[in-house]
């Protein structure tokens, strides 16, 4: 039986434990470990109390993990105690790394010269703590002022900074250290594939997977995780290379049953696809209930200025009339949440921004404003192309609270854009 190397993650920080700051390191580290073929046994979040951090390290060690990855607690302040705790856990003396101290001093001097001239020696003394490391550990040069460390042992402990902008660039160097390579030497090499679906319920996918388990030999060799994210289903499958034929058979079954909903077999997100489809085009958005969320999503990608011309948030009826040229008679006859009005909003965006592509959204996100005819969650969408392409208009009833409805509306609009620009027959 093949036994893969096992790892645990300890995310530190009282602000994360209490929910004031979202944990961005734990999920990211989990994905990186899985990519390496290392089995993730545990992930915990604890506050800045040294006793609690040490308790988590001991729990991981008693669980038999080969590698522990920590994040946070590497700063110069009194509550940054992770390094001291790790040294005690690993039975190693704390020593001053003079070379590291000089590197940190150079970084501080550069920062102070540019932003905050002051008493450099006082700041240097305050940051000397960051150059104190467990004897025998390998230093990972800082991205900010906090160095990372890899402390060899059973288990090996990888100590990384808390800010994701510092942790993520440090990861590759941490993995390449001799201590880390030795700790994960027994890893199993996996392939990982991501499928994305839109317009399919989780229960519908679950039924297909049950049928696959009953009909595809070797199905249980696949490790499948499904997640509902932004109104879409993300299905991640990990498998050893010798069972690739099982994954191929599963993918074919999903194509046969859910070909209209399966929009990505290589992990590409709808945002990536739309960026490609908008090459050579110009788009503008007109939004009411989403208040600019669609425009924000379209501009999340670097380089989006090549195809995004602008956006209008026409929240009130007056704004729809004055900014987008919507006929007041349409609003009076059909209401602001209606297909005729949302089509007029899209047409107004085409004209106002002189573009060839427009998307418009108007809806009732709640918690008030719903009626028997148009309950909360009623949202109208239009994607309009000025160069003879299809105009797609839909009215949907979306579930959830105000935030859910607004986010799902944005996702629906993205997929309507995808369909209009790719001119596919299967429109949600």
Swiss-Prot record:
It comes from Mycobacterium leprae (strain TN). PANTHER family: NICOTINAMIDE-NUCLEOTIDE AMIDOHYDROLASE PNCC, NMN AMIDOHYDROLASE-LIKE PROTEIN YFAY. Gene3D superfamilies: CinA-like, MoaB/Mog-like domain. The gene is cinA. Belongs to the CinA family. Pfam families: CinA, MoCF_biosynth. This is CinA-like protein. InterPro entries: CinA, CinA-like_C, CinA_C, Competence-induced_CinA, MoaB/Mog-like_dom_sf, MoaB/Mog_dom. It comes from the Bacteria.
